[in-house]
């Protein structure tokens, strides 16, 4: 369990310029959470605080009752896996197999057993046929699936997905969201997804909505995403709009998805 209490953060150490303001939230073990919000809402900064990359000026974070601070940082980080928007910096091996194996370096098994473990992890993300491929030559969606397999190899209790589908084409998004859905069903890990992707968010047990550095709503995804007031305050796209934009981009990949979403959002506001 992760308990966040009265967390405030400023990049300038100025409490009058807070990016996050009095954040209070509890993440229960085995649940899947989606954190939604517009650009600049504070959600990505929050993910870096959860993973120990940033330290808040005020408030505290506890992981299974242990305070996240300088003394406990190494211990807690072993419980947390994080996958970033661009996975290229996470690749350390010449092949997909090497990358997954690197995360298993502390496991003492005979080579045959290790090969089976790696194959099983690759199969979880539908990459078992790519073990001998070089990561840099994979598609964006395939790279993210390899990054997920490498994090799963570490067997963390908590996995943070930081905007992992935002740079992917519709097919890549679909493949990665399918993996997230499979992980969600497992119920053995706490999953926290920082996302703009409605298809990710709707799968969550709970959605947490950020706006202007604070949490403005938390609860059941269907209730949250069907609440017009929350959608407008958070400046996020409704699932209906996202589905239309994804469908149009499949038909014509040259569409600018962000521009398309903006136009569809304006159209929906006029017809609501």
Swiss-Prot record:
Transmembrane segments: none
EC number: 7.-.-.-
Binding site for ATP: 37-44
Topology relative to the membrane: Peripheral membrane protein
UniProt keyword annotations, A-Z: ATP-binding, Cell membrane, Membrane, Nucleotide-binding, Translocase, Transport
Pfam family, one: ABC_tran
Subcellular location field: Cell membrane
One GO CC term, this protein: ATP-binding cassette (ABC) transporter complex
Example of a GO MF term: ATP binding
Keyword Repeat set for record: no
InterPro entries per record: AAA+_ATPase, ABC_transporter-like_ATP-bd, ABC_transporter-like_CS, ABC_transpr_CbiO/EcfA_su, ECF_ABC_transporter_ATP-bd, EcfA_1, P-loop_NTPase
CDD domains: ABC_cobalt_CbiO_domain1
Primary residence: membrane
Gene3D superfamilies: P-loop containing nucleotide triphosphate hydrolases
Annotated ABC transporter domain residues: 2-237
Stated role: ATP-binding (A) component of a common energy-coupling factor (ECF) ABC-transporter complex. Unlike classic ABC transporters this ECF transporter provides the energy necessary to transport a number of different substrates.
Sequence similarity: Belongs to the ABC transporter superfamily. Energy-coupling factor EcfA family.
Subunit structure: Forms a stable energy-coupling factor (ECF) transporter complex composed of 2 membrane-embedded substrate-binding proteins (S component), 2 ATP-binding proteins (A component) and 2 transmembrane proteins (T component).
The protein's name: Energy-coupling factor transporter ATP-binding protein EcfA1
Organism: Mesomycoplasma hyopneumoniae (strain 7448) (Mycoplasma hyopneumoniae)
């Amino acid at each position: 369990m992760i308990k966040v209490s009265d967390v405030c953060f400023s990049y300038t150490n100025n409490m009058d310029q807070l990016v996050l303001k009095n954040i209070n939230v509890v993440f229960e073990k085995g649940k899947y959470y989606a954190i939604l919000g517009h650009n600049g809402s504070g959600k990505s900064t929050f993910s870096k605080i959860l993973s120990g990359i940033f330290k808040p000026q005020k408030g505290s974070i506890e992981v299974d009752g242990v305070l996240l601070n300088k003394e406990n940082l190494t211990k807690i980080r072993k419980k947390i896996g994080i996958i970033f928007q661009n996975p290229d910096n996470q690749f350390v091996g010449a092949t997909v197999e090497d990358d997954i194996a690197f995360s298993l370096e502390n496991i003492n098994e005979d080579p045959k057993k290790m090969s089976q473990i790696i194959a099983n992890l690759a199969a979880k993300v539908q990459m078992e046929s790519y073990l001998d491929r070089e990561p840099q030559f994979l598609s964006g969606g395939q790279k993210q699936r390899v990054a997920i397999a490498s994090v799963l190899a570490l067997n963390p209790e908590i996995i943070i997905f930081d905007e992992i589908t935002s740079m992917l084409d519709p097919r890549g998004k679909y493949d990665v969201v399918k993996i997230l859905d499979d992980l969600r069903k497992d119920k053995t890990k706490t999953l926290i997804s920082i996302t703009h992707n409605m298809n990710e968010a709707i799968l969550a047990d709970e959605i947490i909505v950020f706006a202007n550095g604070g949490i403005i709503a938390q609860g059941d995804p269907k209730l949250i995403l069907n609440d017009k007031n929350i959608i407008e305050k958070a400046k996020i796209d409704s699932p209906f709009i996202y589905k239309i934009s994804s469908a149009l981009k499949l038909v014509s990949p040259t569409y600018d998805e962000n521009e398309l979403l903006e136009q569809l959002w304006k159209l929906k506001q006029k017809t609501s």
